């Protein structure tokens, strides 16, 4: 494994993450793929602050969440506690994970796979999925597919990529000169 960078190097602050990612508009998509059996074992890789993990657990599912970033997991544990849920949140790198158990459903949501920058790292993460997935299990991967024409045509324009308020009421606007 090439460990020149850490998964989550660029998304490490739970306040910023929650400020940017407070929508649950994609939750219905993931719920559609969940096993009908509520006793099924579910694993969310790159769970962040529990944005999806917690609502799925509230529906009665047995779910574990894995993330590399400690501040994200601390926030996830805090949210789960406030919701009266006991969820196992695990700090680990998805390129090296070994939980010693198999799951019925594993998913990597919300473009999180893009935190792996090299093919070998992606392959390592997919091997981890294979090693943790039951024989008849389901793996779901959500990733962004960019519009190359838009990127080329708008490469020099500045774009607002996010406006948000963190939990401590700080307002922020993030901009980029890179095409979106």
List the model feature ranges, each with a label.
Residues 136-143:
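Conserved beta-strand signature within the Rossmann-like core of class I S-adenosyl-L-methionine
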Residues 143-180:
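SAM-dependent methyltransferase
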Residues 104-120:
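A short SAM/SAH-binding and catalytic strip from SAM-dependent methyltransferases
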Residues 123-135:
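A short glycine-rich, Lys/Arg-flanked "PGG" loop and its adjoining helix->strand segment in the class I
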Residues 95-105:
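A short acidic, Gly/Pro-enriched loop at the edge of an enzyme's catalytic core
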Residues 1-48:
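Conserved class I S-adenosyl-L-methionine
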Residues 53-96:
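Class I SAM-dependent methyltransferase SAM/SAH-binding core
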């Amino acid at each position: 494994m090439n460990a020149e960078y850490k998964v989550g190097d660029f998304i490490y602050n739970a306040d910023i993450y929650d400020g940017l990612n407070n929508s649950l508009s994609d939750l219905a998509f993931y719920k559609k793929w969940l096993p009908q059996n509520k006793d099924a074992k579910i694993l969310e890789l790159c769970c962040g602050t529990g944005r999806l993990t917690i609502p799925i657990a509230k529906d009665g599912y047995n779910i574990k969440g894995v993330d590399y970033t400690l501040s994200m997991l601390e926030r996830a544990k805090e949210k789960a506690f406030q919701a009266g849920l006991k969820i196992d949140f695990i700090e680990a790198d998805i390129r090296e994970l070994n939980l010693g158990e198999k799951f019925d459903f594993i998913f990597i949501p919300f473009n999180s796979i893009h935190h792996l920058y090299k093919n070998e790292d992606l392959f390592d993460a997919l091997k981890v999925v294979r090693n943790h997935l039951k024989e008849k299990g389901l793996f779901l991967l959500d990733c962004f597919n960019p519009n190359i024409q838009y990127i080329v045509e708008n490469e020099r324009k500045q774009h607002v990529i996010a406006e948000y308020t963190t939990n401590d009421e700080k307002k922020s606007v993030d901009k980029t000169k890179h095409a979106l």
